């Protein structure tokens, strides 16, 4: 387990969520899918969100049930272990719909 403070992990989640939103704010799905650099940057930011979530202890997570902790860790696992099978349509939906919600919920924490 990491010796970093929970606040540091929450900061990582917020910073990475902000990055995802910034990287994709002025583009549509076609530009996302055709721009390898943006795809890689978004995937890396989502991996960081999941990795940071993984290190937040269960007692803390239980205090904030509106944050999808397990789903964030699960997405990280999919992105890292099944890279060649990524569903980019689903990933785009996560970027546009779920990441802003995650950001909002983590800001409340």
From Swiss-Prot:
Q: Which GO terms describe its cellular component?
A: toxin-antitoxin complex
Source domain of life is: Archaea
Keyword terms of this UniProt record: Hydrolase, Nuclease, Nucleotide-binding, Phosphoprotein, Toxin-antitoxin system
Q: Which Pfam families match?
A: HepT-like (PF01934)
Q: What is its EC number?
A: 3.1.-.-
Annotated motif RX(4)HXY motif: location in the chain?
76-83
Task: Please outline how this chain is modified post-translation.
Answer: Modified by cognate antitoxin MJ1379; probably at least 2 successive AMPylation events occur on Tyr-83.
The family this protein is said to belong to: Belongs to the HepT RNase toxin family.
Q: What does this protein do?
A: Probable toxic component of a putative type VII toxin-antitoxin (TA) system, probably an RNase. Probably neutralized by cognate antitoxin MJ1379. Neutralization may be due to AMPylation by antitoxin MJ1379.
Subunit arrangement?
Answer: Homodimer, probably forms a complex with cognate antitoxin MJ1379.
Task: Supply the name of the protein.
Answer: Putative RNase MJ1380
What organism is the protein native to?
A: Methanocaldococcus jannaschii (strain ATCC 43067 / DSM 2661 / JAL-1 / JCM 10045 / NBRC 100440)
């Amino acid at each position: 387990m990491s010796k970093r403070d929970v606040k540091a992990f929450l900061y990582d989640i917020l910073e990475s969520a902000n990055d995802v939103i910034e990287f994709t704010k002025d583009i549509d799905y076609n530009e996302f899918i055709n721009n390898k650099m943006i795809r890689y940057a978004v995937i890396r930011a989502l991996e960081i969100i999941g990795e940071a979530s993984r290190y937040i202890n269960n007692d803390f997570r239980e205090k904030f049930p509106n944050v999808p902790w397990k789903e964030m860790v699960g997405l990280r696992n999919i992105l890292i272990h099944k890279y060649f099978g990524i569903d980019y349509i689903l990933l785009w939906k996560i970027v546009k719909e779920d990441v802003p919600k995650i950001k909002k919920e983590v800001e409340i924490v």
